[in-house]
Amino acid sequence: VTKHDRQAAHRGIRQSMSGLHTWTGLLLGWVLYAMFLTGTVSFFKEELSQWMRPELPRVMQALDPAVVAQRVADEIGRIAPSATQWSIKLPEGRSNSVYAFWRLPVAQDARGFGEGHFDPVTGRQVEARGTLGGDFFYRFHFQFYYMSPFWGRLLAGLAAMFMLIAIVAGVITHKKIFTDFFTFRWGKGQRSWLDAHNALSVFGLPFHVMITYTGLVTLMALYVPWGERAAIKTPAERQQLMAELNAFIPPGNPAADAALLGSIEAMVRQAQMRWGTSDVGRVNAANPGNAAARIAVTRGDAGRVSMSPDYLEFDGVSGKLLSVHDRVGAAAETRGVLYALHIGRFSDLETRWLYFIVSFMGTAMVGTGLVMWTVKRRQKLPDPERPCFGFRLVERLNIASIAGLSIAMTAFLWANRLLPTAMADRAFWEIHVFFIVWGLTLLHALLRPARAAWVEQLWAAAGLLALIPVLNAMTTQRPLWHSFAVGDWVFVGTDLMCWMLALLHAVLAIRTARQGARVRPPRSLAKRDALPTMSGEAAT
């Protein structure tokens, strides 16, 4: 085998990987972009949820979780005395309220459950506007909406697999990828798009691999269920598996005798002696108000690089510690660590910002890859002014998926401030607004020339984002100047971030419009001298 043969074989492998990289990145690229962007926002979902519920009081001082848990448990006992189960999520520094969920007999409530937010200072339920807050983006990024969560998660897993293949193929394809990381040629059309794509890819390459692989691991039992089905044969084995994956109270029949719950505060105190004063995340109850009551006190996520369950189980009446669940098998612990790396709940503020920034770069990596596909292929079209249907479809989907998604996410925030607070099914109507606006951006992209659609939608996103602080000042008692004066940094940070994102979209709109204003070359020179813009159209 000669040197020439080896070089030819190497080129053949790289060319094959190039095609694999291109098509795995494109076919589900629009889904991946939406997953990346909504996942990026989800790193601050607790803060976004606070902003979307301005009625909830701002908590100024650190509170004792044991006292808060007792207050809220007493309140649930008052407002839902027939609840068969309840769960209290305690604030861990990033939340200004306590969230609780309880199950009710169907005869009493057609839904079969109740939920609410509680003031940690008083323990009383707070009437806040109906919204999913940041949890909508969190859920959307791995199970989407308007479809069964099962099929949504399968689609997300398929997209993640495509992403992992595209990353590996991209590294093989770009033999000088690390060298090109230090090279950026501004204003060079296709070369500039490739340089930006390479830089965004290489800078966050370890993160992109980690976040994609760990995303698959979190739902591994859904994607590869056969091993679990073969290993788990009995209900007892199923319960043991559940206990290794979540805080799990074995289901039991209520006893014939009613009995008051023991001191929740005392049970939480026992947990604090093991984990620390502020490291309690949740309190669950089964059969409260019954002699068979059980209480589980679960450790919080902060500062713990594992999502494996760590909890204490108590007799709900006597308060006696029944069992300690602080160890799981090697496989479950590996899964717990990878899950924790994916969602980053262990992180402090600085680490969370690092997650956000690198994930935002991953979003841009996917976006530049989608745009580069149209940039490269327009030059190869027989008539770039009259592209084929497939090319036009990709181009319009790019516009709606990138610029249109920014508009839709911003419209979701606008709906939060403008919809009547007493509106029925308000939380769902916020989501409906998101999808209605997103659909309208696709319609707009189909009806307008590509470059005009890019510019108009980028400007629309910039304008809507820039006006959010104004809208917030007009519709709540927490405008930017007041929030800054009292140190309400969640509201300050949200308003400032909206302005920063508005500036980013404005810069992109201006640059795309300037490219479009350049004079076109003669058709005979177009192929040789084309300088593609964001829409992929030639300009010089």
Where are these regions (language model features)?
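Conserved histidines in hydrophobic membrane contexts and catalytic metal-binding motifs
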Residues: 1-540
